Amino acid sequence: EGLADGTIEVIATDRAPHTAEEKLRGLARSAMGIVGLECAFPLLYRYLVLPGTIPFGRLVEAMALAPRRIFGLEGGVEPGDEADFTVLDLEAEYRLDPATFRSKGRATPFAAWPVRGRAVLTVVGGRVAYDGRN
């Protein structure tokens, strides 16, 4: 509801790529946090956008445009800009599998959840940073 009505402006992830060893030290000594970056978009798209809870544009605003605006970050996709953007395959359906995460962190409560949407290309500063293979 807060995301839909604008009360919540930004969706951020806790990029906590801790190894299994760092997570298995007991509650008081374990590294806190879970992998969020690789799960966030496909989870939010599948469970908020597709059922109609929020429109796709609202998700893009909360995950990309609002953070850029709030932090005063440069970049855009106009001629002459050093573009930062990600191309998404919105039809890709799969189950989250921590073994396939590029992060060294594998801790997630969302393992095996069905999701939809996958990053297939990321451009940072006008250069390809990820092309689905690297």
Question: Language-model segments: what does each one mean?
Answer:
Residues G26-R29, P79-N134:
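C-terminal cap of metal-dependent C-N hydrolases
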Residues E1-G2:
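Aromatic-anchored helix/helix-loop segment that forms the rim or "lid"
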